[in-house]
Amino acid sequence: MKKVCFSFVIMVIALIAAGCGAEDTGTSEDGEGLKIVTSFSILGDVLENIAGERSSVTYIVPIGEEPHEYEPVPSDFQAVSDADVFYVNGLGLEEWLQRLVENTSDVDVVEVSPTIDALPLEESDGLDPHAWLDVKNVMKYVEVIRDDLVERDPDGAEIYVANAEAYLQDLQELEEWIHDQVTTIPEEQRTIVISENAYRYFGEAYGFDTVGIWELNSHEEGTPGQISRVVDIVKELDLPAVFVETTVNKSFMTTVSNDSGVDIAGEVYTDAVGLEGSGAETYIDMMKHNVDTFVSGLSQ
């Protein structure tokens, strides 16, 4: 009797754990596809566009949390153990990755960024992981993912190839739209000031300078010296606006705004898509939201 009760308790704990952590964004209707896990919501959306209904997609880091220093929960380890493949951004984004995969059963880990011309960090060793903020880089992600899925699941190849082609067309249209929108901002005002200096890929692609209080969210954040430096830059450039991210403590940029006398023009999505109802639930929609926010704030 004690053995039965103990087993029941374990089952209940497992069911509770399954309800936390990894987020399921879709399911395979025919059960013949792959069980895909990825690290964060932006990649989750990209993968859903390619996998369609052929394969299920789950992401680890919940929307609203930043992926650099995420702490995996028990259900994340189980999700990765159960997966056919685990797609990650790479470039040092998932600092918790080794800890996760070392404590799960064997799973193929695939970085989606091997064809990216990665930018080196400016203040420390390593690479800037935020390559997805340049749409052309996400198009490279799509090609890597498509080819890997076709190899893993040949029976679904036609679906993956067709979905990838349609999504690449959508991304190309987004790329052209961004370039058109940017032209409305005076060149001397094309500087993005934000907490984490994550928009360097965006800046190089679309003609912006970028300034951050700190370089990466996992580094030392928001020291008085860092804030003072950014305030001086905002004043010197006579910028009309600064910005905050949805996944970062806003108090630091509030201090910059107060000390410089420059308004915070709005929130942008950097490390995650938006929650349902935000209008930024997909990668494409979040990029459109960000560009609209930059244009509105910097065109004053």
Curated annotation (Swiss-Prot):
GO MF annotation, one: metal ion binding
InterPro entries to which the protein is assigned, alphabetical: AdhesinB, Bact_metal-bind_prot9, Lipoprotein_PsaA-like, ZnuA-like
Sorted UniProt keywords: Cell membrane, Lipoprotein, Manganese, Membrane, Metal-binding, Palmitate, Signal, Transport
Top-rank lineage group of the source organism: Bacteria
Subcellular location: Cell membrane
Biological processes annotated in GO: cell adhesion; metal ion transport
Stored Pfam families: ZnuA
Lipid modification (S-diacylglycerol cysteine), residues: 20
Gene Ontology cellular component terms for the protein in this record: plasma membrane
Signal sequence residues: 1-19
Covalent lipidation (N-palmitoyl cysteine), chain numbering: 20
Bilayer disposition of the protein: Lipid-anchor
Residues that hold Mn(2+) according to the record: 68, 130, 196, 271
General function of this protein: Probably part of ATP-binding cassette (ABC) transport system MntABCD involved in manganese import. Binds manganese and delivers it to the membrane permease for translocation into the cytoplasm.
Assigned protein family: Belongs to the bacterial solute-binding protein 9 family.
Record-given protein name: Manganese-binding lipoprotein MntA
Upper lineage: Bacteria, Bacillati, Bacillota, Bacilli, Bacillales
UniProt gene name: mntA
